[in-house]
Amino acid sequence: MKGSNTSRWAIATGIIVVALAAAWYWHSHSSSNEATTQQQRPAGGGRHGMRGGSLAPVQAATAVSKSVPRYLTGLGTVTAANTVTVRSRVDGQLMAIHFQEGQQVKAGDLLAEIDPSQFKVALAQAQGQLAKDKATLANARRDLARYQQLVKTNLVSRQELDTQQSLVSEAQGTIKTDEAAVASAQLQLDWSRITAPIDGRVGLKQVDIGNQISSGDTTGIVVITQTHPIDLVFTLPENEIATVVQAQKTGQPLAVEAWDRTNKAKLSDGTLLSLDNQIDATTGTIKVKARFNNQDDALFPNQFVNARMLVATEENAVVIPTAALQMGNEGNFVWVLNSDNKVSKHLVKPGIQDSQTVVISAGLSAGDRVVTDGIDRLTEGAKVEVVDAHSATTASEKPASREHAKQGANS
């Protein structure tokens, strides 16, 4: 029994010793790893840096001084400078068409012909009547001459002379009527040849050869639209009228550009032609008309386009990317970088602006560097790292990647 107790104590003592040794070994290695980790970890960045001591990556641009044009924009519709519905001025059968649909024609070009037979007959009749009445007049004049001689010898009375004089005058009046009839018949014959009244592009024909047409037809034969030049009618807000009028007082024509619906492609260049004489009370806008040469046929009647009219040019303007301009409780501001790459907030007054750039009227000077990307990570006085677009994207993705890797390891 005694030997058995001794054996139990020996085993228990051994187990205790092994447990103590294991505990010492684990504690010493844990402390060593923690110390190593503390030595390798960089100092925290505080409010001037990001996690792990790295600087916030930003993109920057330098404010530049340049001339900036001021444009007024509006949606407009292209309209033909002149539009004419070509109609026949006489009645008859359409005998020939001398144009191709869609072709450009000049004023005076022959477009169509109506059967001239009836008009030739009418002209011949009028000319025959004129010739007859001219012969009658000649005979009356000869008789008058004889009467004038005979009245001197009292062979004819004074009354007979006066009667003959009246016959001559009557014949002269008849001649004038006949001449007018001849001119009218000639005009009807001329009108059987239908010509273009203006320069322009002909549309689709409205009637085919062989049809009977009349001067009362409202449809006409074809429509001609003058496209060289061509007009653009667009609208501007009524509060811009003073700007346009002031620009017109310089005496220089105001340039107008026509852009497509997406505002990506410029179609043509023209000049301001006129302003309407009244404001549309319903919309609070005024109509403006510009004229374009359109020799390349880039503009087409009834086409919708965006109009841009140059009214002024601001010289030596301070310009920055639009992305740098921010809005806060105090108004518009930008983040400005100093030589140490530390940022500070500057309140600014913006001017002319588009989707790419903005003019800063006050609060910034040419040569100042402004932050254009990474703005949401900035605080006053923070030091940042200026990187290009690719570097900024990579840097912003790294913290998320490390966090994802850490979560994967823990799982």
Swiss-Prot record:
Residues 1-21 form the signal peptide. It is a peripheral membrane protein. Its main location: membrane. Residues 399-411 have a biased composition (Basic and acidic residues). Belongs to the membrane fusion protein (MFP) (TC 8.A.1) family. PANTHER family: MULTIDRUG RESISTANCE PROTEIN MDTA. This is Multidrug resistance protein MdtA. It comes from Enterobacter sp. (strain 638). The gene is mdtA.
